[in-house]
Amino acid sequence: MLGHIKLMTVAPEIEAIRKVVALHEPNILVVDTTDEVHVDRFDGEIQRQNMVIGALKEMAQKHNIIVFAVHHVNKVSAAGNTISLHSLKGSTNIVQKADKVLMVKGKRDERARIICSEKSRDEGRFEMTCAFDFETMTFKELL
């Protein structure tokens, strides 16, 4: 049913992601999580993040695709369900480099989620409440 979706189930090198994008020419690339992408020769976490995000942005521009780079929130914010841009695990470096930041808020054991735009260079912010359907892999807006 979801044959149009291709999955890599191992933490890839950034070069492996480049090859997959060139081979399959996707419209959308989801990297979950940016922490798991391996890069060569880096000095510290900020430089590693710069290399990963820089490579993903380059692929987006070169191949005219949408890239979703997943970055998790810290445990304290997740446990208290008080998620904001300051809740991101580690450095806010990723937020600074992103064109848009979407946050998915909600409790792990509930189907309803709030999807909100926390940062956007081109458009205004939005927020909507959705339910996720695991069979169709889609969100349905709850009014």
Label the model's feature ranges:
Residues M1-G44, M51, R108-D109:
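Conserved inter-motif catalytic segment of the P-loop NTP-binding fold
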Residues D43-E45, S84-L85:
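Short glycine-enriched, charge-decorated loop/helix-capping segments at active-site entrances
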Residues I46-R48, F134:
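Glycine-rich, phosphate-binding/catalytic loops in enzymes
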Residues G54-L143:
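Phosphate-binding/switch region of NTP-binding enzymes
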